[in-house]
């Protein structure tokens, strides 16, 4: 066989494999996804950059495509928390917890992560509002559902934001210890630090 023909054939086959693989990845990434996932991811990116209004519109769009989309519901709750609309955030989180409790399948680790993150975030809201005993109960509930999901963030988060972030377990323990002290000796709120509490999203 002619070496030039063999080389041309090999190059064409290589290109065909690359195009087919790329097309498959593109299809899987954009077209073969559950309804609402794309808009939820866009909302999450905007939420992380502090663009709360646009983030909320993407989360709402995701919920139009897929009512009860757990990522979009959590995203809405986080927007409410970041904009200090705590009552609305509690309603969103209570709905999410109730819906997941009724519909979560046992073999869904991401769903368990969301079910743990919801009471952890509710605990943050209650903590900021001074309802420390209720906050502690929500932190404990989050730890019971899935401690790994609400534990210390990853390496990149530590480098970019905080090398020693507080965890749900740390905060629950701290509240418990403070509530054992006489009321005039308790230190349960430091507004500047409380405002920096890390929201949980699996």
Indicate residue ranges for each PLM-predicted region.
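Alpha-helical segment of the N-proximal tetratricopeptide repeat
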Residues: 31-65
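Flexible helix-coil transition and linker loops at the boundaries of alpha-helical arrays
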Residues: 26-30, 98-113, 148-159
């Amino acid at each position: 066989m002619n070496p030039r023909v063999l080389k041309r054939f090999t190059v064409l086959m290589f290109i065909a494999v690359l195009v087919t693989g790329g097309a498959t990845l593109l299809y899987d990434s954009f077209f073969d996804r559950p309804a609402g996932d794309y808009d939820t991811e866009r909302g999450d990116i905007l939420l992380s950059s502090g663009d709360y209004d646009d983030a909320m519109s993407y989360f709402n769009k995701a919920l139009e495509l897929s009512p009860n989309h757990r990522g979009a519901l959590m995203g809405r709750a986080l927007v409410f928390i970041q904009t200090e609309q705590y009552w609305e955030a509690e309603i969103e989180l209570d709905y999410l917890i109730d819906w997941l409790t009724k519909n979560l399948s046992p073999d869904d680790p991401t769903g368990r992560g969301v079910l743990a993150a919801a009471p952890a975030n509710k605990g943050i809201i209650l903590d900021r509002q001074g309802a420390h005993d209720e906050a502690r109960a929500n932190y404990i509930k989050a730890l019971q559902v899935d401690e790994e999901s609400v534990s210390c963030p990853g390496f990149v988060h530590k480098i970019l934001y905080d090398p020693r972030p507080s965890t749900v377990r740390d905060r629950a323990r701290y509240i418990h210890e403070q509530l054992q002290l006489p009321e005039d000796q308790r230190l349960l709120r430091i507004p500047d630090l409380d405002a920096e509490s890390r929201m949980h999203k699996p």
